[in-house]
Design a protein with these regions (language model features):
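Residue-level signal for functionally critical sites in structured catalytic/ligand-binding pockets
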Residues: 12, 40, 67
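Negatively charged, low-complexity tracts enriched in Asp/Glu with abundant Ser/Thr
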Residues: 2-14, 19
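Short intrinsically disordered terminal tails
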Residues: 1-2, 66-68
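Acidic, low-complexity, intrinsically disordered interaction modules
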Residues: 16-61
Length: 68
């Protein structure tokens, strides 16, 4: 895990492997504690690259963009 303090919050970068995909997560936390997340991953079965966006306060992806 990599964590960096910014002027208006913090950013945390972690890697993950959930069995279906592996990639990284970038989590931004503002000074009020609100979090937003972008995950960049590759599906293991198809090799499809994705960007998954979670808006502040959302547990489910708000958008999934296929990159290839």
């Amino acid at each position: 895990m990599l964590k960096a303090k910014l002027e208006n919050g913090t950013i945390k970068v972690t890697n993950y492997d959930d069995g279906m995909a592996e990639g990284i997560r970038l989590i931004f936390t503002d000074k009020d504690g609100n979090e937003s997340e972008i995950a960049l991953d590759i599906l293991k079965d198809t090799g499809e690259a994705r960007a998954i966006i979670y808006k502040v306060g959302s547990d489910e992806p708000d958008e999934c963009i296929t990159l290839n």
